[in-house]
Amino acid sequence: MKRSRKFSSSTTTTTVIHTFYNDHTTPPATKEIPIETPLPATKANVKTNATAAAARIQSGYRSYRIRNLYKKISSINREANRVQSIIQRQETVDAIRSDEKERLRMNETLMALLLKLDSVPGLDPTIREARRKVSRKIVGMQEILDSISETKDEIQWWNYNDLGGVDSGQGGGAWPLYWEEAVEEEMCRERGGEEMERFCAQYLGFRCFQRFLRE
């Protein structure tokens, strides 16, 4: 019978720490961070950009206001055209002649339009010119109303020669002339020169302009 032997082995690990001392002193490393100073030209560019931006904003706001003001003038002009079409009717002329309140009512309507025009600031030459043009139209209609009222008993409104007059046994009360023709004759007699030429061409039509040239 054999004997068996068991051998056991053990391993020992030793850790040796070596510390090295550096006798030479190493200076700490430094890192330089450059600081850039803006040049004066850069500051000028920033200021210029801000000024340009402000100018664009002001220009946009001005254009916005001008558009709104022009729309307001256009609205007043449309209303003036409507009143003008009413005044051109023969029944309106008859009402103005027979009723003083009707003339006052029409005058108040025209004055209200003039007040609306006065409330429009003249920020731009285009706005001022448009406002002036509509104002002249309204003032011209006021003059027509006054002429209708003031000349209701004068010969240009009755034309007795064409009717036969009182001597022929016919009373008044007829309207041989339309209001446009009567007003045109009145205006052509009162005014003259280039001013009347422009007024006739712009407001009273081609017939008045022809009459003005004949005279």
From Swiss-Prot:
Keywords: Calmodulin-binding, Chaperone, Mitochondrion, Transit peptide. Transmembrane segments: none annotated. GO terms for molecular function: calmodulin binding; protein-folding chaperone binding. It comes from the Eukaryota. The keyword Mitochondrion applies. Induction: By calcium. Its main location: mitochondrion. It is found in: Mitochondrion. Residues 1-14 form a transit peptide. Pfam families: BAG. InterPro entries: BAG5/6/7/8 (IPR040400), BAG_dom_sf (IPR036533), BAG_domain (IPR003103). Residues 72-149 form the BAG domain. Binds to the ATPase domain of HSP70/HSC70 chaperones. Interacts with HSP70-1. Co-chaperone that regulates diverse cellular pathways, such as programmed cell death and stress responses. IQ domain mediates interaction with calmodulin. PANTHER family: BAG DOMAIN CONTAINING PROTEIN, EXPRESSED, BAG FAMILY MOLECULAR CHAPERONE REGULATOR 5, MITOCHONDRIAL. This is BAG family molecular chaperone regulator 5, mitochondrial. It comes from Arabidopsis thaliana (Mouse-ear cress).
